[in-house]
Amino acid sequence: MTADSALYIPPYKADDQDIVVELNSRFGAETFTVQPTRTGMPVLWVPRERLIEVLTFLRQVPKPYVMLYDLHGVDERLRTHRRGLPSADFSVFYHLMSLERNSDVMIKVALSERDLNLPTATRIWPNANWYEREVWDMYGITFTGHPHLTRMLMPPTWQGHPLRKDYPARATEFDPYSLSAAKQDLEQEALRFKPEDWGMKRHGENEDYMFLNLGPNHPSAHGAFRIILQLDGEEIIDCVPEIGYHHRGAEKMAERQSWHSFIPYTDRIDYLGGVMNNLPYVLSVEKLAGIKVPQRVDVIRIMMAEFFRILNHLLYLGTYIQDVGAMTPVFFTFTDRQRAYKVVEAITGFRLHPAWYRIGGVAHDLPRGWDKLVREFLDWMPKRLDEYETAALKNSILRGRTIGVAQYNTKEALEWGTTGAGLRATGCDFDLRKARPYSGYENFEFEVPLAHNGDAYDRCMVKMGEMRQSLRIIEQCLKNMPEGPYKADHPLTTPPPKERTLQHIETLITHFLQVSWGPVMPANEAFQMIEATKGINSYYLTSDGSTMSYRTRIRTPSFAHLQQIPSVINGSMIADLIAYLGSIDFVMADVDR
């Protein structure tokens, strides 16, 4: 079956269409409802009773879908544009990736409000654990057979499920907040760790285990992040990562902001990524709108995104080396970051959170003298990377602390949804800029740095290589910056080019409406993933033909990377955990959203 197939034919790749044929052959075409979208992948609805069977087939098919990339839900109750889709009060989607096919597929399940139950997928993909917990936390959907279905982002005492459409979206819709001494005691008691709840023993045959809170304010936790460690001496027997302390409800806020006014919020997801955060969002909105941006816009966006990749990696490098005991390098990396920020501020007007990309372009054109600033940075940075590699990364103490530590292979990385440098350090050559070029990356020459041991040291070396390749990309942007407009000539470009508003009354009216109310995007779904600073980051947007998003799903790499911690570090020492945390490259805003 096909929903609204006459309205839009999705641009599937051959491998995407192949899996639809394979599914129809195995289960029968009547099993599926094919949903036309602008996601660029097959989207198929399946009956709940066939879900696990279909997911297992996709996990085991030749060239299998080895990665559960994302899993989340949608409250469908207020959605008006649903013609041809299965009746649903809520839905859950499973976004699966096959690296061998370089192909994705999305499986959806419709649920009635009276029966919000699904079988768990944790027996197929271990990383379904945290995603299912978050879906229960946000929507109240139960996953039967889940090993520990508890709150993920919200406090244990929280009432309600925030991403439901009938849940308040603004603080003014709640009673004024107060925290009495009794309530504070209640909240603290709720956070007390009980080993028995997690199947942990307090005693072994000949020893008593110690339970230690690492965080939520430990400097090596890199943010408000708590890991409960079960210890035998200094050996980690087991551990439980606990997140949510930095949760700000970013996906809920997207439902109350216009498509345009949500751009600054994207900056605050990975707050070290700057405009890199804007890119998947605006690309996804542009798919909804049918906007094709000028080539100059593509090149400007790539250049600024690579600047922020370098800024992120310099901070990572300095703090990583500091975590294992060397204090000096972090001061040098911050000095070099200042040089990069000088360029960023001159071009965008801001440093950490420029919010500079726009729907259909960028905020303004490159200023006079931008090329001189970029050239100065390109002349400075390569020799600094040489110094870091010689003085710090070849240091015998650092190598001793990190080589062979927190090691995992490609198979394990994919099972846990690991992407970015953490995946490429295992020898897996998968970088979206090469495998699935976006925003014009196919026009640039660069290499994908790889390592093969998958340990804490290799992850750092991959990041070093990425900085060199980012410099190479920026050099090409500098030498080959095309002429042309910095915004697309399209009715949904927001805001429209300023020059046009001064000449044409219709453009001025459009500007007024789009900035005050927001542009109206066609009803559909769109998706865009990018190779961000910490791994693959994506925005999956659902438009119901309004000025605001009906549903915004933000998939971040750090969420998946922290879930992997127990499988990697159990059996190691506390000192190895510190080196491992430093090698991951995460910020809690990226985890908690």
From Swiss-Prot:
This is NADH-quinone oxidoreductase subunit C/D. InterPro entries: NADH_DH_suC, NADH_DH_suCD, NADH_Q_OxRdtase_suD, NADH_quin_OxRdtase_su_C/D-like, NADH_UbQ_OxRdtase_30kDa_su, NADH_UbQ_OxRdtase_49kDa_CS, NDH1_su_D/H, NiFe-Hase_large. Keywords: Cell inner membrane, Cell membrane, Membrane, Multifunctional enzyme, NAD, Quinone, Translocase, Transport, Ubiquinone. The gene is nuoC. It is an enzyme of class 7 (translocase). In the N-terminal section; belongs to the complex I 30 kDa subunit family. In the C-terminal section; belongs to the complex I 49 kDa subunit family. Its EC number is 7.1.1.-. GO terms for molecular function: NAD binding; NADH dehydrogenase (ubiquinone) activity; NADH:ubiquinone reductase (non-electrogenic) activity; quinone binding. SUPFAM superfamilies: HydB/Nqo4-like, Nqo5-like. The keyword Isomerase does not apply. It catalyses: a quinone + NADH + 5 H(+)(in) = a quinol + NAD(+) + 4 H(+)(out). NDH-1 is composed of 13 different subunits. Subunits NuoB, CD, E, F, and G constitute the peripheral sector of the complex. The keyword NADP does not apply. Residues 208-593 are annotated as: NADH dehydrogenase I subunit D. NDH-1 shuttles electrons from NADH, via FMN and iron-sulfur (Fe-S) centers, to quinones in the respiratory chain. The immediate electron acceptor for the enzyme in this species is believed to be ubiquinone. Couples the redox reaction to proton translocation (for every two electrons transferred, four hydrogen ions are translocated across the cytoplasmic membrane), and thus conserves the redox energy in a proton gradient. PROSITE patterns: COMPLEX1_49K (PS00535). Pfam families: Complex1_30kDa, Complex1_49kDa. It is found in: Cell inner membrane. It comes from Pseudomonas aeruginosa (strain ATCC 15692 / DSM 22644 / CIP 104116 / JCM 14847 / LMG 12228 / 1C / PRS 101 / PAO1). Residues 1-184 are annotated as: NADH dehydrogenase I subunit C. It is a peripheral membrane protein. One of its GO terms (cellular component) is plasma membrane.
